Amino acid sequence: MIAFLSGRVVSRGAETAVIDVGGVGMTVHCTPAALARLRVGEEATVATALVVREDSLTLFGFADDDERDTFERLQTASGVGPRLALAMLSVHTPDALRRAIATEDTAALTRVPGIGKKGAQRIVLELKGKLGEPGGDTAATPEQSAAAAPRNWRAQVVSGLVNLGWSTREAEAAADAVAAEAGEQPDVAALLRSALRRLSRA
C-alpha cells in the first residue's frame, strides 16, 4: 500500500491534484478537505490509499490518516466502492460518519448522492461498531465545520458530482448555477441535490 505521498503540488483541480514525487507526476483523487490544504507550487504530504483494479491503479488522497482509514472501512459495506466512499467523505467528516452509524442516523447518510434509504439502512447494519466511536481527537468541531463550509462548499459539490460520474466541466457548471443558493452557511447536501436536479434536466 502507498500510505502517503510527499512532493511539490504541480496542479490542483476540482477533485484531483498532481504531485511531483521524485520527478514523477502522481495524480491523486482527493477529498475536499485534502484539496483545501494543497497549494500549487508548495511542498505537501498527502495520506493516500491505492485502489487496484484489472484495468487501473487509482490513488485516493486524504487530509489525514483518519480520513484514509474511514475511506477503507466504509468499503467493507456491500455496495460501497471507492467512488461512493469518497462521496461520503465529500459530504461528511469522518466523525460525522461515525456518529451517523453509531446513532443509526440514516437521514444523514441519504444526504450523500447515490445513497437511498435502503442503502443507508444496509450501511448502518454492516458498519455498526466498525468505524470506532464518534468524538475522536482528529474530528472537526462543529465550529470548525461551520467555518469551513463557506470556503469549501463548491469543492465538495463538484467532487460529489464527479464521483457520481459527471464530468468536471459539467460539475463545475452545476456548482456555479447553484451558487446563489449557498448563503452564509451553505448546506452542502442540499446544494448537491439542487445541482443534480439541474444536471438531470439538462
From Swiss-Prot:
<comment type="function">
    <text>The RuvA-RuvB-RuvC complex processes Holliday junction (HJ) DNA during genetic recombination and DNA repair, while the RuvA-RuvB complex plays an important role in the rescue of blocked DNA replication forks via replication fork reversal (RFR). RuvA specifically binds to HJ cruciform DNA, conferring on it an open structure. The RuvB hexamer acts as an ATP-dependent pump, pulling dsDNA into and through the RuvAB complex. HJ branch migration allows RuvC to scan DNA until it finds its consensus sequence, where it cleaves and resolves the cruciform DNA.</text>
</comment>
<dbReference type="GO" id="GO:0000400">
    <property type="term" value="F:four-way junction DNA binding"/>
</dbReference>
<dbReference type="InterPro" id="IPR036267">
    <property type="entry name" value="RuvA_C_sf"/>
</dbReference>
<dbReference type="GO" id="GO:0005737">
    <property type="term" value="C:cytoplasm"/>
</dbReference>
<dbReference type="Pfam" id="PF01330">
    <property type="entry name" value="RuvA_N"/>
</dbReference>
<dbReference type="InterPro" id="IPR013849">
    <property type="entry name" value="DNA_helicase_Holl-junc_RuvA_I"/>
</dbReference>
<dbReference type="GO" id="GO:0005524">
    <property type="term" value="F:ATP binding"/>
</dbReference>
<comment type="similarity">
    <text>Belongs to the RuvA family.</text>
</comment>
<keyword id="KW-0227">DNA damage</keyword>
<keyword id="KW-0234">DNA repair</keyword>
<dbReference type="GO" id="GO:0006310">
    <property type="term" value="P:DNA recombination"/>
</dbReference>
<dbReference type="GO" id="GO:0009378">
    <property type="term" value="F:four-way junction helicase activity"/>
</dbReference>
<dbReference type="Pfam" id="PF14520">
    <property type="entry name" value="HHH_5"/>
</dbReference>
<keyword id="KW-0238">DNA-binding</keyword>
<feature type="region of interest" description="Flexible linker">
    <location>
        <begin position="143"/>
        <end position="152"/>
    </location>
</feature>
<dbReference type="GO" id="GO:0048476">
    <property type="term" value="C:Holliday junction resolvase complex"/>
</dbReference>
<dbReference type="InterPro" id="IPR010994">
    <property type="entry name" value="RuvA_2-like"/>
</dbReference>
<dbReference type="InterPro" id="IPR000085">
    <property type="entry name" value="RuvA"/>
</dbReference>
<dbReference type="InterPro" id="IPR012340">
    <property type="entry name" value="NA-bd_OB-fold"/>
</dbReference>
<dbReference type="InterPro" id="IPR011114">
    <property type="entry name" value="RuvA_C"/>
</dbReference>
<keyword id="KW-0963">Cytoplasm</keyword>
<dbReference type="Pfam" id="PF07499">
    <property type="entry name" value="RuvA_C"/>
</dbReference>
<protein>
    <recommendedName>
        <fullName>Holliday junction branch migration complex subunit RuvA</fullName>
    </recommendedName>
</protein>
<comment type="subunit">
    <text>Homotetramer. Forms an RuvA(8)-RuvB(12)-Holliday junction (HJ) complex. HJ DNA is sandwiched between 2 RuvA tetramers; dsDNA enters through RuvA and exits via RuvB. An RuvB hexamer assembles on each DNA strand where it exits the tetramer. Each RuvB hexamer is contacted by two RuvA subunits (via domain III) on 2 adjacent RuvB subunits; this complex drives branch migration. In the full resolvosome a probable DNA-RuvA(4)-RuvB(12)-RuvC(2) complex forms which resolves the HJ.</text>
</comment>
<dbReference type="GO" id="GO:0009379">
    <property type="term" value="C:Holliday junction helicase complex"/>
</dbReference>
<feature type="region of interest" description="Domain II">
    <location>
        <begin position="64"/>
        <end position="142"/>
    </location>
</feature>
<dbReference type="InterPro" id="IPR003583">
    <property type="entry name" value="Hlx-hairpin-Hlx_DNA-bd_motif"/>
</dbReference>
<dbReference type="GO" id="GO:0006281">
    <property type="term" value="P:DNA repair"/>
</dbReference>
<feature type="region of interest" description="Domain I">
    <location>
        <begin position="1"/>
        <end position="63"/>
    </location>
</feature>
<feature type="region of interest" description="Domain III">
    <location>
        <begin position="152"/>
        <end position="202"/>
    </location>
</feature>
<keyword id="KW-0233">DNA recombination</keyword>
